[in-house]
Design a protein with these regions (language model features):
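Nucleotide/phosphate-binding catalytic cleft detector across ATP-hydrolyzing
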Residues: 1-42, 47, 96-99, 104-124, ...
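Gly/Thr-rich phosphate-binding beta-strand-loop-beta motif of the actin/hexokinase/Hsp70
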Residues: 29-72
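Alpha-helical context
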Residues: 30-31, 44, 70, 74, ...
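Extended active-site and interfacial segments that coordinate phosphate-rich ligands
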Residues: 58-82, 143-150
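A near-ubiquitous, low-amplitude feature marking generic local secondary-structure context
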Residues: 60, 66, 85, 170-177
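N-terminal phosphate-binding loop and adjacent alpha-helix
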Residues: 71-111
Length: 190
């Protein structure tokens, strides 16, 4: 809504030449036209490894890739151990841990491509259902007890600033949908 009052003025001042970055039905940015890139990042949060990709948001071209050991391994080597840890202590530590890793990987991706994290307008994340839930800060108790259903299965979109990823302040985070208790968004992405 904060963009709406300036739309008319900006278009008039720039002789109709303005740049709007739109995600779904939301205007993420409106400013005078420039040559700055519109970037996206995608992450596959695996139990062991997190893989990241930096993409040109206009062409879809892959600009850089990076990967790292999932830092949640310090809380348990596998999904069951991490789920049990979160049942006992909550999901906040595990969630913060993986979010910090994504922020670090965003820096690595941008450095490799000689781009700025401020030019990333969307981050998409996938993972098995437990990794999905822990990233979002959801204790996966519904996954460790019958009938082993996810707490949330639909795709979600959030303001990325809530996840402290260090991208454009108006950027979005998209968590792809999961299918079932142990069929996650990583399968949806295939």
């Amino acid at each position: 809504l904060e963009i709406l009052p300036v739309i008319g003025r900006l278009i008039k001042e720039k002789n109709g030449k303005a740049r709007a970055i739109v995600s779904g039905n939301q205007i993420l940015e409106l400013k005078e036209q420039d040559d700055r890139p519109v970037l996206m990042a995608a992450f596959d949060i695996g139990t062991t490894t997190v893989a990241g990709y930096l993409l040109d948001g206009k062409t879809g071209e892959q600009l850089a890739t990076a990967s790292a050991l999932n830092t949640q391994t310090e809380y348990g080597a596998d999904v069951i151990m991490r789920a049990n840890y979160s049942l006992k202590y909550g999901a906040e530590e595990l969630s913060t841990c993986i979010r910090k890793l994504l922020r670090k990987l965003i820096g690595t991706l941008c450095e490799a491509a000689k781009k700025s994290p401020e030019d990333i307008y969307q981050v998409s994340v996938v993972g098995n259902t437990c990794m999905h839930h822990l990233f979002l800060g959801i204790v996966p108790d519904s996954l460790v007890h019958a009938p082993y259903n996810p707490a949330i299965s639909q795709g979600l979109m959030f303001p990325a600033e809530k996840f402290h990823l260090g991208i454009h302040p108006g950027g979005q985070l998209v968590a792809l949908p999961v299918i079932a208790g142990f069929v996650g968004a990583d399968t949806v992405a295939c």
